[in-house]
Regions:
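Membrane-interface transmembrane helices that cradle and orient dolichyl/undecaprenyl
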Residues: 22-41, 68-79, 126-127
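Hydrophobic/aromatic-rich transmembrane helices and adjacent perimembrane loops
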Residues: 279, 291-317
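Short acidic/glycine- and proline-prone juxtamembrane loop motifs at membrane-interface regions
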Residues: 4-12, 55
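Membrane-interface alpha helices of multi-pass inner-membrane proteins
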Residues: 41-55, 89-91
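Transmembrane-embedded, aromatic-rich helix segments that form part
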Residues: 17-18, 43, 58-71, 113-122, ...
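Signature aromatic-anchored transmembrane alpha helix within multi-pass, membrane-resident enzymes
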Residues: 260-264, 312-350
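Lumenal/periplasmic acceptor-binding loop at the mouth of the active site in multi-pass
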Residues: 161-258, 274
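Hydrophobic, aromatic-rich transmembrane alpha-helices
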Residues: 122-130, 244-264, 316
Length: 370
């Protein structure tokens, strides 16, 4: 799925790049949190989140994981502080979405300068917070400012549409059409319930549809494609264990167990990222059957999170190997284990995936463009 996203003219590759960036930066912040200058990393994260939602909303699903890193780095665990964290995270989430994403542009209906008034009010709040040496308040307000600044890239859509280019989907060249475009109203509104959107008799109940189609077919299958194997490049492709022999999956599960045994808190952070960018998306989207195309591209954030456990699993195996091969000549043996891991997993995945993803000789896009 990562490979597919990388060669498709879509938003999902850059969206995952921003997700990976904010996750890397929050880990860097955790290492430097005792240094007051580390606040700059939090501000960079806020700006990247703003840029990211200018591409796709998936990036905001990393916010709970970011909040957990900050919490575990600054607080000792207690249920009271943990629930306080959850409340703050929910408030912060709603400030961004729907607050900045939907409500701020909607103020254009009141007046074209109303968003500018809000923007200036945030700047004024920053000035007084900094002047009063309110570190947390100033950090929060500057973060809001940077998120708005990053999100302002959406203005390019409005400017471009007013020039009436040949491709101008939804024609967002007026305030009404622009808000229609921002709110994705062309896709309709699907609620979380009921889950059953198909009366096919093969589904016995709403729960059966949710599990068999939405979870198993529309997520578990994609997840196993990445780490077990895919039997072909066609709609509805099944899982094929003969591709990767499930070695990446097993190494990732070992990495998860190793991570939990060594650092439960950071394991919970990665699990939160995995859950929010995977199964939580499934619950939110409430997809109907059938879908016009495969949707694996939307869940690459969770595949990225699991890949972290594959890396941790490889490190854990090397650590165990160094203990098993104690003595003066242990380095060549550990190097052999590393080489075997490299050949058995990434090299094998490259070899088995290359033909399916190679565009050599594929002129379909060119032919259609003519």
């Amino acid at each position: 799925s990562h490979w597919f996203n990388a060669v498709e003219a879509e938003v999902y590759a850059i969206s995952l790049f921003f997700t990976a960036m904010v996750f890397y930066l929050i880990v860097r912040w955790a290492d430097e949190a005792d240094n007051p200058a580390s606040d700059r990393l939090l501000l960079i994260i806020a700006y990247i989140i703003g840029l990211a939602i200018g591409a796709h909303l998936l990036n905001i699903l990393a916010i709970p994981a970011i909040a957990l890193v900050i919490y575990f780095r600054k607080k000792e665990f207690s249920w009271s502080t943990f629930f306080a964290l959850m409340a703050i995270t929910v408030v912060g989430f709603f400030v961004i979405y729907p607050g900045i994403v939907k409500w701020l542009p909607a103020t254009l209906k009141i007046s074209a300068i109303f968003p500018l008034v809000i923007f200036l009010a945030v700047l004024l709040g920053i000035y007084y917070a900094v002047k009063a040496h309110q570190r947390v308040a100033s950090l929060a307000l500057i973060s809001v400012f940077l998120i708005i600044l990053g999100y302002s890239t959406y203005g390019v859509i409005f400017i471009r549409s007013t020039l009436n280019p040949p491709i101008d989907e939804n024609n967002p060249d007026t305030i009404e059409r622009f808000l229609f475009y921002l709110n994705r109203e062309q896709y309709g509104d699907v609620g979380l319930f009921p889950r059953r959107w198909n009366n096919d008799p093969k589904y016995s109940s709403e729960w059966d549809f949710f599990w068999r189609y939405q979870v198993d077919h529309m997520y578990n299958r994609y997840f196993l494609w990445q780490f077990v194997g895919q039997d072909g490049d066609y709609q509805g492709a099944r899982v094929d264990i003969s591709k990767f022999y499930a070695l990446p999956l097993l190494l990732g599960l070992f990495g998860l167990a190793h991570h939990v045994s060594k650092d439960r808190r950071r394991a919970l952070v990665v699990f939160t990222l995995f859950l929010m960018t995977g199964y939580a998306v499934i619950v939110y989207l409430n997809q109907n059957d059938p879908q016009p195309r495969e949707r694996d591209y939307a869940y690459t954030g969770s595949f990225y999170a699991f890949a972290l456990w594959i890396g941790i699993g490889a490190q854990g195996l090397l650590a165990y190997a160094s203990r098993w091969f104690k003595g003066k000549n242990n380095l060549p043996r550990v190097a052999l284990v590393l080489a075997l891991l490299f050949v058995a997993i990434p090299m094998n995945m490259f070899a088995k995936n290359y033909r399916m993803h190679s565009r050599a000789g594929n002129f379909v896009a060119w032919d259609y463009s003519r």
